[in-house]
Structure formats: structure tokens, C-alpha cells
Regions:
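Structured, solvent-exposed acidic/aromatic patches
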Residues: 1-177
């Protein structure tokens, strides 16, 4: 969406290359429609591959294994899972103007709240404890991306103890004419 035309206005304009394999060679720049179709195809394949995702039967499994087995299939809310793929399919289909398909995928994801898989956040958790409020509505997180170097990145770019020239900040000159 950021690097191409407004899809609803001209989906046939060139947008970005699409890589479905690791390569050192540049791929051709595709139209927004071609990119969207490839995204949908990849997500549909992911949906099929995740058909037996434990999130569907056991929920998010947000704790470590108690029997010493691998945690690879646990913490499903923090990994790309079946419902996260469906949410992305809803989003892409809505972007493409396929409202019926978008509605079907979104409805399937919303139904998980009734099943206790991704329940809507409890108001008391948001405002109940000033010391530890749930400001990200963690029960509603469908998947997350993690950068293990986040604290280092923050220190390098945003730590106020660094010299002003080495901290990302808004330049006052940009705020005036």
C-alpha cells in the first residue's frame, strides 16, 4: 500500500517487485494487481499449510511446555498462525475491493473471541491496574514480530543520554515554513 498506486484508483500501475524466493537478481516490477494476487496466493497456501495449527484446537498456548517438549508450536499469538493468516487475507481482500471475501475471513477471526482463543480485552485489565495496564490489548494480538536487539536499537537511536546529534528527534526547522 505504501509503495504503489492507490489500488482502487489504478491497480494496473506498476508498484513493486515481488520475491517468492531468495535471489541476488532483481525481479521485475509488477502492477499493484499482480502483487495483490501473489500476496493472496501466498496467504491461501499458508492457510492450507496451517490447517492443523494448534491455535485452532488448543488456543494460543501462551506458556512454556510443562512436559519438557519443544515450545516450537506454543506461543501461537506471537507467531504467524492460522487466524493471523485469515486476518491478513481479510485485509488484502478489502484493499482489493473484494468485500465479500474480506467479510468472510474477518468474521471467522472475530468468532475466535467467542471460542476464547483471541478474546476481546477485559476493560478491567486496561484501566484496573495503573502499575501494569494492558495497553496493547494482549489477548487480541493475533501475531507479533520480535526484534531481539530492540533494547540496543532503542539505546542507539532514542536514548536521551546520547549526544543530541545521535538521537532521532523532530528537527524544529521542519516544523516551520
Amino acid at each position: 500500500r505504501l509503495f504503489g498506486p492507490v489500488y482502487a484508483k489504478d491497480s494496473e500501475k506498476k508498484a513493486i517487485p515481488y520475491y517468492n524466493k531468495q535471489t541476488n537478481s532483481p525481479e521485475p516490477i509488477l502492477t499493484a494487481k499482480e502483487v495483490a494476487e501473489k500476496v493472496v496466493a501466498d496467504l491461501e497456501e499458508a492457510r492450507i499449510l496451517l490447517a492443523n495449527d494448534p491455535v485452532k484446537t488448543e488456543g494460543t498456548l501462551m506458556s512454556g511446555s510443562q512436559d519438557g517438549t519443544s515450545n516450537f508450536m506454543r506461543y501461537r499469538a506471537l507467531r504467524l498462525n492460522y487466524y493471523a493468516v485469515e486476518a491478513l487475507l481479510a485485509r488484502v481482500n478489502l484493499y482489493m475491493g473484494n468485500k465479500t471475501e474480506a467479510f468472510e475471513y474477518a468474521t471467522d477471526v472475530i468468532k475466535t473471541a467467542d471460542q476464547g482463543i483471541f478474546p476481546f480485552v477485559d476493560k478491567s485489565l486496561v484501566i484496573g491496574s495503573p502499575a501494569d495496564p494492558d495497553r496493547i490489548f494482549s489477548s487480541e494480538v493475533l501475531f507479533a514480530l520480535t526484534n531481539t536487539s530492540r533494547s540496543k536499537i532503542h539505546k542507539n537511536f532514542y536514548d536521551p543520554s546520547r549526544l543530541p546529534n545521535y538521537v532521532f528527534r523532530m528537527d524544529d526547522n521542519l516544523m516551520s515554513n
